Regions:
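C-terminal, non-catalytic "cap/extension" segments appended to globular domains
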Residues: 55, 60-68, 73-75
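Short, conserved, GDST-rich strand-edge loop motifs in beta-rich repeat architectures
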Residues: 33-47
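Non-catalytic accessory segments flanking enzyme active sites
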Residues: 1-35, 66, 70, 77-81, ...
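Catalytic core of nucleotide-sugar-dependent glycosyltransferases
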Residues: 47, 61-63, 95
Length: 198
């Protein structure tokens, strides 16, 4: 179970959360967490495992707000909180993606989503975030590109590659393509092929 201690005169209040959640942090007094199991509340639609959810822990009657929900093509990987944003990494058709959810300090439960223009055919991982600012660091790498460190800044949001490991081979004449295979039960399976570009 999960307990919350806020402005409650030193007392704990138990939150009615599922048994299996992954707490990501607090932003503007709102608790952010991902679900590791389906969450069914009385009189409400079930929220599937793999969703990212925000909840006001001060209000016992507050309803959860879904920030990210998985579907047939998208899977949540991770999320982290800065001062005013939530950094979310996810897979979209097996390609790494990242987006920023901006929280307005003057409009409760209002989020603005910005998908970051990172390289395609890559994996994307959160390295670190700063809760005293809106800065975050992402690691991006692919079959042909060595690990890169990207800074997600504080405006719009700013995005800048600030470091890259020296390449171990010349990738100029190579290319990566994504293909689909179908299993006997009809499941679509993505795979990548590295081949000469000419």
């Amino acid at each position: 179970e999960t307990a919350f201690q806020g402005k409650l005169k030193g007392t704990l209040r138990w939150l009615t959360l599922p048994d299996r959640v992954d707490l990501k942090g607090m932003i503007h007094g709102t608790l952010v967490f991902s679900l590791e199991e389906d969450w069914t509340q009385a009189g409400e639609n079930s929220i599937p495992a793999g969703s990212l959810v925000a909840l006001d822990p001060h209000d016992p009657q507050a309803k959860p707000e879904i920030l990210f929900i998985p579907d047939s093509g998208k899977v949540l990987e991770n999320a982290a909180v800065t001062r005013n944003t939530i950094i979310v990494t996810y897979l979209e058709h097996v390609q790494g993606r990242a987006m920023v959810l901006h929280a307005s300090p003057d409009a409760k439960n209002r989020w603005h989503q910005v998908v970051l223009p990172l390289p395609d055919m890559s994996s994307v991982h959160i390295v670190d975030t700063d809760q005293s600012s809106d800065a975050a660091f992402l690691k991006v790498e692919s079959f042909l590109s060595p690990p890169q460190l990207w800074l997600v800044g504080t405006t719009q949001p700013g995005l800048e590659q600030i470091r890259q490991i020296k390449p171990l081979f010349n990738a100029a004449e190579l290319a990566v393509v994504q293909l689909q295979a179908r299993s006997p039960d009809g499941t679509e399976i993505s795979y990548f092929l590295v081949l000469p570009s000419t």
